[in-house]
Structures are given as structure tokens and as C-alpha cells.
Amino acid sequence: MPRAVNGTIHKNRRRRILKDAKGFRGARSKLYRTAKSAVMKAGQWAYRDRRAKKRDFRKLWIIRINAAARENGLSYSVFMNSLKKLGIHMDRKSLAELAFNDREVFNSLVEKIKVAG
């Protein structure tokens, strides 16, 4: 009986790694061993950056809200605290969207805060 060498399984594994390495530069997309390590490292970076992306967007939203609030004479912390006290429950993403794209609505929120406080 001939020796079984897992031909199709082996070939499919190599094909999948080389497919995932498509677009990498040089040997990283051609040679299995270097492609395998490049794909593993790319996976680590992707895992890390999926988490960093959430932090980065939150930072961006806070910067945008702060800039728009300061144009109206409030700091970010005073603005957010006043919203909380007034019972206006809006997340930072939607506040940043208002500050960036719909300044009139954002300014009306600021006026509401100034009237109340």
C-alpha cells in the first residue's frame, strides 16, 4: 500500500496562505514560508488595530465636539456635563456628527445649555 502524504490537504493549506498573502511585496507573496509568517503578522496587526480603531474614533469625536463647543464659549467637559444634567442622552458619535455637518442643531444644543445654566 502506498504512503499517504496528505496531498490535497497540504496543497489547500499552502494555497490558502498564498491567497491571503496576495498583494504583499516581494517574496512575502510568492514563497510559502515567508508568506506564512507575513500572513500571521498581518493578522496580529489587524487584531491590534481593530481595537485601536475604536479608541481613535472616540478621540476624533471628542476633538470635534470640543472644537465646536469652544467656538460657542464652552469647554468639552462643561458641555458634556451640562448635557448630562439636562437629561439629553446623546452619544459622542452623534454629537460629533452634528458638530461637523449640522452646526445649527449643535448651536441650538449649546444655547439650551446656556439658558439652563
From Swiss-Prot:
What InterPro entries does the database record attribute to this sequence?
Ribosomal_bL20 (IPR005813), RIBOSOMAL_L20_CS (IPR049946), Ribosomal_protein_bL20_C (IPR035566)
GO CC entries: ribonucleoprotein complex; ribosome
Keyword hit for Ribosomal protein: yes
Q: Name one GO molecular function term.
A: rRNA binding
User: A single GO BP annotation from the record?
Assistant: translation
Question: What are the UniProt keywords, alphabetically?
Answer: Ribonucleoprotein, Ribosomal protein, RNA-binding, rRNA-binding
Pfam family of the protein (one): Ribosomal_L20
Gene3D superfamilies, per this entry? 6.10.160.10, Ribosomal protein L20
Question: Record's family?
Answer: Belongs to the bacterial ribosomal protein bL20 family.
Function (record text) = Binds directly to 23S ribosomal RNA and is necessary for the in vitro assembly process of the 50S ribosomal subunit. It is not involved in the protein synthesizing functions of that subunit.
Entry protein name? Large ribosomal subunit protein bL20
Q: Which organism is it from?
A: Leptospira interrogans serogroup Icterohaemorrhagiae serovar copenhageni (strain Fiocruz L1-130)
